[in-house]
From Swiss-Prot:
Record lineage: Bacteria, Pseudomonadati, Pseudomonadota, Gammaproteobacteria, Enterobacterales
Function: One of the essential components for the initiation of protein synthesis. Stabilizes the binding of IF-2 and IF-3 on the 30S subunit to which N-formylmethionyl-tRNA(fMet) subsequently binds. Helps modulate mRNA selection, yielding the 30S pre-initiation complex (PIC). Upon addition of the 50S ribosomal subunit IF-1, IF-2 and IF-3 are released leaving the mature 70S translation initiation complex.
Subcellular location: Cytoplasm
PROSITE patterns registered for this protein in UniProt: S1_IF1_TYPE (PS50832)
Species this protein is from: Wigglesworthia glossinidia brevipalpis
Protein known as: Translation initiation factor IF-1
CDD domains: S1_IF1
Similarity comment: family membership: Belongs to the IF-1 family.
GO molecular function: ribosome binding; rRNA binding; translation initiation factor activity
Keyword rRNA-binding: yes
GN (gene name): infA
Claim: Protein biosynthesis is one of the keywords in the record: yes
Assembly and oligomerization: Component of the 30S ribosomal translation pre-initiation complex which assembles on the 30S ribosome in the order IF-2 and IF-3, IF-1 and N-formylmethionyl-tRNA(fMet); mRNA recruitment can occur at any time during PIC assembly.
Keywords on record: Cytoplasm, Initiation factor, Protein biosynthesis, RNA-binding, rRNA-binding
GO cellular component terms given for this protein: cytosol
Amino acid sequence: MTKEENIEMQGIVLDTLPNTMFKVELENKHVVLAHISGKMRKNYIRILTGDKVTVELTPYDLSKGRIIFRSR
């Protein structure tokens, strides 16, 4: 079974929610619920409101995603 292609988009963190969840507004003005990837959590990378992030979305559910990179 091959791995499906994930969609990567840029966005801005709007709000911080419990359990390392975030509301992120994407470039196309959609708001998604995103959590931190495991490597970011392991390396204690902090994400604050207003940060520019890269979000990975699966084609199956475009309302949830994973934050994989925080821009400087």
